[in-house]
Amino acid sequence: MAKKRRKLNKDFEKKIYSSKKNVELVLAKIYDIDDEDIQKEYMSAFNKVVFLYDGLKEDYEVKGYNDNSEKLLTNYKSAFNLFEEEFEI
């Protein structure tokens, strides 16, 4: 049986790439925090954002652009914005 090709979307790929860079930047800033307790607190709070980003990226890599893609991106962006509001970094 032929494997179904996943649908690609260049604009969505740019959004995923931008999201990746944002996650990497925040992680780098968290790793630069000297106080271990504060670093753990920030990391714990940011784990949800990383989890949502990983889910978004994996869904796109496996299934391509689909009905759920925009919802996953919105969930990631909401979590990222909430983190930025609650934690100064």
Predicted features along the sequence, with ranges:
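Acidic, low-complexity, intrinsically disordered interaction modules
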Residues: 37-73
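A structural signal for well-ordered alpha-helices, especially hydrophobic packing surfaces
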Residues: 27, 34, 50-57, 80-87
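Generic L/I/V-rich hydrophobic alpha-helical segments across diverse proteins
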Residues: 16, 20-23, 42, 46-49, ...
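Amphipathic alpha-helical binding modules
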Residues: 68-89
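Compositionally biased, low-complexity segments enriched in small residues
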Residues: 3-5, 11, 18, 43-44, ...
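Short intrinsically disordered terminal tails
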Residues: 1-10, 85-89
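N-terminal acidic leader/helix
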Residues: 5-37
